[in-house]
Amino acid sequence: RALKLARKFWPGPLTIIVKKKEHIPSVVTGGKEGIGLRIPNYEVTLKLIELCGGAIIGTSANKSGFKAAKSAEEALRILNGKVDLILDAGPSPGGVPSTIVDVTGDMVKIIRIGPIMPNEIEEALGEPVEVVPKPSRIKRK
């Protein structure tokens, strides 16, 4: 399932949660059994991934539940300077946060609705998915 989604939507605004491998330290996943994977469609990030040998570990430049920063200065302010490094590539091209899909269980779950809608995920997989967010909070394209 993860491969089907990755082939269809990457690079792009889709985060796929998969079961973490045993060798992945729990500090990377916050103690959770799943890990979110994403390949964004942003040239600077894609080049950084390439220069790092194919993968990097990171989080978004925001606190959970808050909007993502749109600039390096805003990220520093939001995170109270508690970061080791910021790569300032100019204003963020981001808009709506990525769609998050969890493929760790028997049924695929959409954890957050983003630019990719549930019907697009179902079409790519050829099976129904469970939408966890309340429908009233779903933003349409």
Q: How would you name each of these model-derived features?
A:
Residues 1-141:
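Active-site-adjacent structural elements in enzyme catalytic cores
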